[in-house]
């Protein structure tokens, strides 16, 4: 079991159950879209985020990004880290049919994928060196590298996200945040050469 300093917020009880078998950390639920109406739960998330930091770990589908963006708008960014799972087609074992977008959610991920997503988010893991955001890659760099602001940039971003196992619904700003956790500018340029 991996001990993590930050609390983790997930969409529902099955996600919470999956994570609780892998990590030792406080795990809170949004109850899916319930977070939009539950002011007390949002207040709790704000308090926990200010005390120990909060890792937002939602599914890679459209609904997961709506929930993630709601949390992002309600809690100061300095308290948040974002863990992203890759887009993997399939369905969870407990379900009769795949979800609307046909992707596995957090509950359907392997322990290795979950731990890698948490490490990539910069989770503070006991016994490991803390990963810090370098901030070396800027929005201007994304434009220079052809990932934003020019014809074809959206397609290039999609190819990059697929190569890096990042979800397709990431905005350019969310992609920038993830890239700064994973690469410096030279490292990103090398990855882009392989596309």
For each feature predicted by the language model, list its residue ranges.
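C-terminal, charge/polar-rich interaction regions
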Residues: 116-119, 123, 128-195
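Activity-critical C-terminal alpha-helical subdomain
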Residues: 85-132, 139-142
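Acidic, glycine-rich catalytic loops of TOPRIM or P-loop NTPase phosphate-binding modules used
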Residues: 6-7, 13-17, 21-51
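Short beta-strand scaffold positions
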Residues: 10-11, 58
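Conserved nucleotide-binding/hydrolysis micro-motifs of P-loop NTPases
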Residues: 14-15, 61-63, 88-90
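Phosphate- and other anionic-substrate recognition elements at nucleic-acid/protein interfaces
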Residues: 44, 62-65, 69-76, 112, ...
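Acidic, metal-coordinating catalytic cores used for nucleic-acid/nucleotide bond scission
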Residues: 34-37, 57-67
